[in-house]
Amino acid sequence: MAVYNYDVVILGTGPAGEGAAMNASKYGRKLAVVDSRRVVGGNCTHLGTIPSKALRHSVKQIIEFNTNPMFRQIGEPRWFSFPDVLKSADRVISKQVASRTGYYARNRIDMFTGTASFVDERTVEVVTPSGAVERLVADQFVIATGSRPYRPSDINFNHPRVYDSDTILSLSHTPRRLIIYGAGVIGCEYASIFSGLGVLVDLIDTRDQLLSFLDDEISDALSYHLRNNNVLIRHNEEYERVEGLDNGVILHLKSGKKIKADALLWCNGRTGNTDKLGLENVGIKVNSRGQVEVDENYRTSVSNIFAAGDVIGWPSLASAAYDQGRSAAGNIVESDSWRFVNDVPTGIYTIPEISSIGKNESELTAAKIPYEVGKAFFKGMARAQISNEPVGMLKILFHRETLEILGVHCFGDQASEIVHIGQAIMNQPGELNTLKYFVNTTFNYPTMAEAYRVAAFDGLNRLF
């Protein structure tokens, strides 16, 4: 058995693993990463963020071609199959893998392929695809193995008509009707993607409101636009059982309803990839969803083992995972690059997309904070009119007395880009976080960023 010695070993090469590896390598640590795939990137690159967002972009282009009258001079509206659209995602994945492989190579980071499990607090064994066993000994470890779709034991995911958010990327046909169970972020994003391809979608929500953590107005707007695109949303429903057929699937709900479709996409929760790590050998416990508990330093119950990314739960975003991994490594190398990641904007890539940061109206009302609202509707913005993207708005919540910005909520094209301007101002200390910044700053014209100025004036006009 080959034995290798390192300062730090990182399990996983997704955003959290990459963030940890790059930061630790900058401080001269001898590093190795372990991944079950022969290529880097983790589930984010191969099954999650990258393919789903590439799919969304392609579908958005199809919608633009089919609905913009200008394109009728070129030809009639076209129908595209899901497998054809998926090819664009494959190209993006290949480019991402090439880029990220270069990061590891330039930083002289050793890579091992296989399944890693802890032998003790200083040792992991890696079983390679060929069955060989290699042993890695290190002073510090970072668990960044990510997550996978949660699969209830009473649902047969081996049935050819039953998919989860990983296996849906192997769908070889375009269903006429699709049931999506679970109306969280992933469920809503795929509802947008498939409905944009003309698929009739039944979106089953176990709660009474879509994405209830959002501002109510934004959640309502999402519901409206999904319904406007022929998505049937069923709230407060839970499954009784799933019946697989040769030509489809029937979803039996506890309410007594039965829904038949060509396929079922299960999007109800995720579980941490911890079951094969041998955590019991080092005394690390996980919760019912396989997630590892960490402190504010991203340290587990074992002092030399850290964890970051989806494997620790909230917020389960690629952006946060990278910073969490970087912060975990910052603690290992005792640098000032550490911070607890809690200032995280929400980015939801539905059609139209959604992004927000800070408090929403319900939270501010419950806290009895005197706030006011400023809005800018995209239909009145010159840039949105030029790009033919009139749907959406920017909403700024601010303190009536101090003008401190308390929350920014955006719905529409480029929402996930627009929100960062508000985030930057909200992070300024003291009186520098003020609505006045937007009225005293000259924005390029025409731009979507100008919506901040419009919303700020709208909010100030409400004061008396």
From Swiss-Prot:
Cofactor binding summary note: Binds 1 FAD per subunit.
Keyword Cytoplasm carried by entry: yes
GO BP annotations, alphabetical order: 2-oxoglutarate metabolic process; NADP metabolic process
InterPro entries: Class-I_Pyr_Nuc-Dis_Oxidored, FAD/NAD-bd_sf, FAD/NAD-binding_dom, FAD/NAD-linked_Rdtase_dimer_sf, Pyr_nuc-diS_OxRdtase, Pyr_nucl-diS_OxRdtase_dimer, STH_gammaproteobact
Reaction(s) catalysed (UniProt annotation): NAD(+) + NADPH = NADH + NADP(+)
Ligand binding (FAD): 35-44
E.C. numbers: 1.6.1.1
Localization of this protein: Cytoplasm
Cofactors, names only: FAD
SUPFAM superfamilies assigned to the protein according to its UniProt record, in alphabetical order: FAD/NAD(P)-binding domain (SSF51905), FAD/NAD-linked reductases, dimerisation (C-terminal) domain (SSF55424)
Cellular component terms (Gene Ontology): cytosol
Primary localisation category: cytoplasm
Keywords, comma-separated and alphabetical: Cytoplasm, FAD, Flavoprotein, NAD, NADP, Oxidoreductase
Signal sequence range: none
GO function terms (MF aspect): dihydrolipoyl dehydrogenase (NADH) activity; flavin adenine dinucleotide binding; NAD(P)+ transhydrogenase (Si-specific) activity
HAMAP family linked: SthA
Purpose of the protein: Conversion of NADPH, generated by peripheral catabolic pathways, to NADH, which can enter the respiratory chain for energy generation.
Family: Belongs to the class-I pyridine nucleotide-disulfide oxidoreductase family.
Protein name: Soluble pyridine nucleotide transhydrogenase
